[in-house]
A protein has these predicted regions:
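Structural signature of tandem-repeat unit edges
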Residues: 4-18, 28-49, 55-74, 83-97, ...
Length: 215
């Protein structure tokens, strides 16, 4: 169903036992995911509007209306790819692994909240970003992100498709900016950089920034 942009809902029957990672990639209008209660491999527990692998508690695919259940432990790559109607997401304390491309091109995302009990990730200071706590690495940002002062690196594709924000301030503690961190940030007009910024630090993102900024 990749790129079925008009698909609004999907029902997974009891006999389905194998679903590919990108089966519902770029289904930008998807708002409802229901798995038959008799299915022994997948579920959509608690009417969460998500496809979950039951044994591993892995969220395989979400949609605009997904509420991540409290017992999910992993969020797969491209799980929310192009969920353009997704405006906010809450990461439960149980989640210990999130792929860096899990929220690619979620152009409407304005709020990211991580439960305070999560020991792997946080959204410190209401920053509206997903941060890996141990490394102070910003993994996923959104249109309302304010990068905390203690962040030291920005992941590849961290702000991919955040097309509404016009400016961003990079704190002085940031020493690494990943490849394509600001890809498709079409409204971005200014980036405030610390004095410590070096050309080698900016090199990975120069190509993607050039269409939007006067560099």
């Amino acid at each position: 169903f990749s790129n079925c942009s008009a698909l609004t809902g999907i029902e997974i029957p009891v006999n389905v036992v194998n679903i590919g990672r990108t089966a519902f990639e770029s289904c930008s209008a998807l708002a409802s995911i229901i798995v038959d209660e008799g299915n022994t491999v997948y579920d959509s527990r608690g009417n969460c509007n998500a496809l979950i692998e039951t044994v591993t508690n892995t969220l395989m695919r979400g949609c605009d209306n997904t509420i991540i259940p409290d017992d999910v432990t992993v969020i797969n790559g491209f799980a929310f790819n192009r969920c353009s109607g997704l405006t906010s997401i809450r990461i439960p304390a149980s989640v210990t692994k999130i792929a860096i491309d899990a929220f690619h091109r979620c152009i409407g995302l304005t709020s990211i909240i991580v439960d305070e009990g999560n020991t792997v990730y946080d959204s410190r200071g209401n920053c509206n970003a997903l941060i890996e706590t141990a490394t102070n690495r910003l993994i996923i940002g959104c249109n309302n992100t304010i990068i905390p002062d203690d962040v030291t690196s920005i992941s590849d594709y961290a702000f991919y498709g955040c097309n509404a924000f016009e400016s961003i301030i990079i704190p002085s503690g940031v020493t690494t900016i990943g490849q394509n961190a600001f890809e498709e940030c079409i409204s971005l007009e200014s980036i405030e950089l610390p004095e410590s910024t070096t050309f080698s630090m900016l090199r990975p993102v120069m190509a993607t920034l050039r269409p939007y900024l006067a560099l």
